[in-house]
C-alpha cells in the first residue's frame, strides 16, 4: 500500500497576506480523498524527528537556535516564517514523515510526503521557507542505519537545491542532481554533483528532452535509493518560476522520473516542494497529479 505522510499541523497558520500558499497542505489530501485516489488508510501522521538524527545533517549551533526559539530575527526573515513552538513541531514532523516514507518505500516501492522538499535549508542556515532539510535528514538516516549505500536525490523544483548540495558536498555516497532555473533564486548557488541550469521560458518539449537524456546518466552512480523533489513551481502559471511548462508536461515529468525508478527497481520517496501559482487550484492539481502518477505506476 502506498503510504503518505500528512498531519493537520502541516497547514500552519500564517499572517494574513503571507505569500506562502499554506492552504495547499489541507487541499491536497482533501482532493485525493474526494477523487477516490486514496483512502484514509494511505495517510499516516508522523511524530517529531529525534535530535540526534537532525544533527547528522544540521550544525548543532543552528539546531540549538531553532530548538530554543532564539534564532535571530534576521535569520527568521531569511526563512520567511515567524518562528514559534508550533512551527518547529511542524518542521520536526515533516522531517520524520520523510524518514518514515523512505522506510515505507523500501517495502512498497514508493511513498510520499504531502509537504517537505525543504531543499534550501543548509547545514547551518534556513531560507526560502525551509528550516530543516527533510530529504537530507532522511538520506543521512538511511546511510547511518546501514539500510542503503548509494543515494540519489533528484531535485526538479524550479529553484536549485542549494542546501542539499551544501550538506552533501563532501559525501561520496549521496549524488545530488538539481535541474532548475539558472537565473532564479538562490542567486548564489551551491555546487550539486550535477546541476542543469535552465533558461527562463523553457517550454514542454525542451524541458522533457533534457530530463529524458539525463535520467540514464544518473545510473552511472549506481544508486540503491532515490529521493525525488517534485516542485510544481515549474508551471507557466507560477509567479516565481519563470519557466513555461504546462500542467501536462509537469505530470509527464513526474511520470518519467517515477517510471525510471520503477524500471530500475529503485525505491523512491517523494516530497512536494514549491508551487506559487496565483490560483491555488493550479498548485493543488499539479501536486495531486504527482500522487496519481506514482500510485498508477507502483500500486
Regions found by a protein language model. Give the residues of each.
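Metal-dependent C-N hydrolase catalytic cores
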Residues: 2-136
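A general "terminal functional-core" signal
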Residues: 73-299
Amino acid at each position: 500500500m502506498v503510504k503518505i505522510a500528512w498531519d493537520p499541523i502541516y497547514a500552519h497558520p500564517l499572517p494574513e497576506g503571507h505569500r506562502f500558499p499554506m492552504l495547499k497542505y489541507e487541499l491536497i489530501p482533501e482532493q485525493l480523498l474526494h477523487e477516490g485516489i486514496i483512502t484514509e488508510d494511505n495517510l499516516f501522521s508522523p511524530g517529531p524527528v529525534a535530535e540526534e538524527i537532525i544533527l547528522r545533517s544540521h550544525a548543532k549551533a543552528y539546531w540549538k537556535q531553532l530548538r530554543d526559539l532564539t534564532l535571530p530575527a534576521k535569520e527568521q526573515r531569511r526563512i520567511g516564517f515567524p518562528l514559534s513552538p508550533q512551527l518547529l513541531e511542524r518542521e520536526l514532523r515533516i522531517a520524520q514523515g520523510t524518514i518514515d516514507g523512505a522506510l515505507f518505500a523500501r517495502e512498497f516501492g514508493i511513498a510520499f510526503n504531502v509537504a517537505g522538499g525543504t531543499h534550501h535549508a543548509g547545514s547551518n542556515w534556513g531560507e526560502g521557507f525551509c528550516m530543516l532539510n527533510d530529504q537530507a535528514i532522511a538520506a543521512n538516516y538511511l546511510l547511518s542505519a546501514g539500510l542503503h549505500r548509494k543515494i540519489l536525490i533528484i531535485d526538479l523544483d524550479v529553484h536549485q537545491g542549494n542546501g542539499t548540495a551544501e550538506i552533501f558536498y563532501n559525501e561520496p555516497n549521496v549524488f545530488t542532481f538539481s535541474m532548475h532555473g539558472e537565473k532564479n533564486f538562490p542567486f548564489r548557488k551551491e555546487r550539486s554533483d550535477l546541476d542543469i541550469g535552465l533558461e527562463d521560458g523553457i517550454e514542454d518539449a525542451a524541458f522533457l528532452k533534457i530530463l529524458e537524456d539525463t535520467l540514464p546518466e544518473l545510473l552511472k552512480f549506481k544508486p540503491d535509493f532515490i529521493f525525488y523533489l517534485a516542485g510544481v513551481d515549474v508551471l507557466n502559471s507560477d509567479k516565481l518560476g519563470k519557466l513555461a511548462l504546462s500542467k501536462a508536461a509537469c505530470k509527464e515529468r513526474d511520470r518519467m522520473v517515477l517510471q525510471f525508478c520503477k524500471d530500475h527497481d529503485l525505491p523512491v520517496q517523494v516530497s512536494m516542494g514549491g508551487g506559487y501559482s496565483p490560483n491555488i487550484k493550479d498548485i493543488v492539481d499539479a501536486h495531486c497529479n504527482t500522487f496519481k502518477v506514482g500510485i498508477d505506476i507502483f500500486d
